[in-house]
């Protein structure tokens, strides 16, 4: 029941955006997709979602990925200007408004908004929200569907650190409850080390490193990826590493 990537390639003319990507991602975890800008993180997520042309094979639960059966939040997701927060979240269950929505779905949507500390905004128009608040609403929309595969491209980039940690706490709880697989492109290595079970590093269109966070987020790997010196510390009894820039 894994997400399997076999020899996945994406080319724009003569430029290799992704070159022979191979990985097997198991459900029941958060996978952090990291790497410098321009290494193909967004392209890989879009390829998995099936909205980007690629060569090779991508399968989920032994079948091609069906966008209608997964959760996909691309970078800079569009919001419907005239909809309220609650209406926007409910679109996660129905593709269009006007359909009869049961009270159970309304209650579930309201509960997710409360989890994200924005329940008080339920009747506010989406265009009156900050960028970070819009991201929270759009993530709530994806979670309402309860997908077994959730693909997130920089889904917390407009949030401050406190709200980012709240989102990851919510994602961890979601994974624990549903056994879903969450794949998220993320730049913050400290957040990746704290909340991601597995790390997939991309560099120069290839998989540079892949494995458990403790094994992959090393001083050598980070220095080779980003060209910066780091110190990696592991607190006694802690599950994850923390990355600190030297200086």
List each language-model region with its residue ranges.
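Helix-to-loop junction immediately C-terminal to a conserved catalytic motif
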Residues: 49
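The feature captures the beta-strand-to-loop junction immediately N-terminal to the Walker
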Residues: 34-36
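Conserved ABC ATPase "signature" region
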Residues: 104-121, 138, 146
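Conserved ABC ATPase signature
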Residues: 125-129, 133
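Catalytic Walker B motif of ABC-type/P-loop ATPase nucleotide-binding domains
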Residues: 150-154
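Conserved structural motif at the start of ABC-family nucleotide-binding domains
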Residues: 3, 18-20
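ABC ATPase nucleotide-binding domains
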Residues: 223-247
